């Protein structure tokens, strides 16, 4: 009985607290930390369920040749010192969304990249919202609200395709188990699918990543998450506090730049809602593989 109560208390540990915030602020991080409304009633256990566990990531076989800087330079040369998808393609920008308690960051980031690159290439003349829910529920090589991985996700979008959010809206916000794969749109009409032409992994070269962003738009990446990220409000994030890896988190890289004091950064679109961070986005140090952000990055090819 005592052990059960102890486990319940551990699992109910709040993700954020003012005491922990003070400890972070005492370290004088190069970014602003605060109490995030998004996580004020979330436990650490619930937060972990929003992330991707290591056992949900497949062994990396190295079978997918990375896109090299030489290939990128054939697409864009010289590579500009800064790029922001929101400024370059304002007609394509959609608000940052909130995945809720479902561990579906893998789907939100992939669908974001898919739609943004379609718009950047002129396939869609304006921003179209594609369905995260269809991908979560129907990509059976992934784990629904319990995480997913890059290659099975992009394989699904290449061979099966994505439908629109108008057809299948997101319903797993408060779920930890994915809803069944729908046979028709929410209104009963047939599901129309839009396929990717293929996908590729970008090399770990920072210039190659920058060039691929400029050449075709946002890319998908993944980071290791530590406790301090949940407190992020603004600035260029650098891991400052917390030694425990809480899980992996898939994200959308939408640009890069350099601060006035010379700090290079990536611009990231998150899936924790528009009230977190910088209107749902955050910046993270570029060029030092901060939180493994430059380890594994994917681009989608479109007709």
Swiss-Prot record:
Its EC number is 3.4.22.-. Induction: Not expressed without supplemental iron. It is found in: Vacuole. GO terms for molecular function: cysteine-type peptidase activity. This is Cathepsin B-like CP1. The gene is CP1. It comes from the Eukaryota. One of its GO terms (biological process) is proteolysis. Belongs to the peptidase C1 family. Residues 1-19 form the signal peptide. Coiled coil: none annotated. The active site is at 105, 249, 270. InterPro entries: Papain-like_cys_pep_sf, Pept_asp_AS, Pept_cys_AS, Pept_his_AS, Peptidase_C1A, Peptidase_C1A_C. Disulfide bonds join 92-119, 102-145, 138-181. It is an enzyme of class 3 (hydrolase). Glycans are attached at residue 41. SUPFAM superfamilies: Cysteine proteinases. Thiol protease which is required for parasite excystation and invasion of the proximal small intestine of the human host. It comes from Giardia intestinalis (Giardia lamblia). Keywords: Disulfide bond, Glycoprotein, Hydrolase, Protease, Signal, Thiol protease, Vacuole, Zymogen. One of its GO terms (cellular component) is vacuole.
């Amino acid at each position: 009985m005592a052990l059960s109560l102890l486990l319940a208390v551990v699992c109910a540990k709040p993700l954020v607290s003012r005491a922990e915030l003070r400890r972070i602020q005492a370290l004088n991080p190069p970014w602003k930390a605060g109490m995030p409304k998004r996580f004020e009633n979330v436990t650490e256990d619930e937060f972990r369920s929003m992330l991707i566990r290591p056992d949900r990531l497949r062994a990396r076989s190295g079978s997918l040749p990375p896109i090299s800087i030489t290939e990128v330079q054939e697409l864009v040369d010289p590579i500009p010192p800064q790029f922001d998808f929101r400024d370059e393609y304002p007609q394509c920008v959609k608000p940052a969304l909130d995945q809720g308690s479902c561990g579906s960051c893998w789907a939100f980031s992939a669908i974001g990249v898919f739609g943004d690159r379609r718009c950047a290439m002129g396939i869609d003349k304006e921003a179209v919202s594609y369905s995260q829910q269809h991908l979560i529920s129907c990509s059976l090589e992934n784990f629904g609200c319990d995480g997913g991985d890059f290659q099975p996700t992009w394989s699904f979008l290449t061979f099966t395709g994505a439908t629109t959010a108008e057809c299948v809206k997101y319903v797993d916000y408060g779920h930890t188990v994915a809803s069944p794969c729908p046979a028709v749109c929410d209104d009963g009409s047939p599901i129309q699918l839009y396929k990717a032409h293929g996908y590729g992994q970008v090399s770990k070269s920072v210039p190659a990543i920058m060039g691929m962003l400029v050449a075709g738009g946002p890319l998908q990446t993944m980071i290791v998450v530590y406790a301090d990220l949940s407190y992020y409000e603004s600035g260029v994030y650098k891991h400052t506090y917390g030694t425990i890896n809480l899980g992996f988190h898939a994200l959308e890289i939408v640009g890069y730049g350099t601060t006035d004091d010379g700090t290079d950064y990536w611009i990231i679109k998150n899936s924790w809602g528009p009230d977190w961070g910088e209107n749902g986005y955050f910046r993270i140090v570029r060029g030092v593989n901060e939180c493994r952000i430059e380890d594994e990055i994917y681009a989608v090819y479109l007709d």
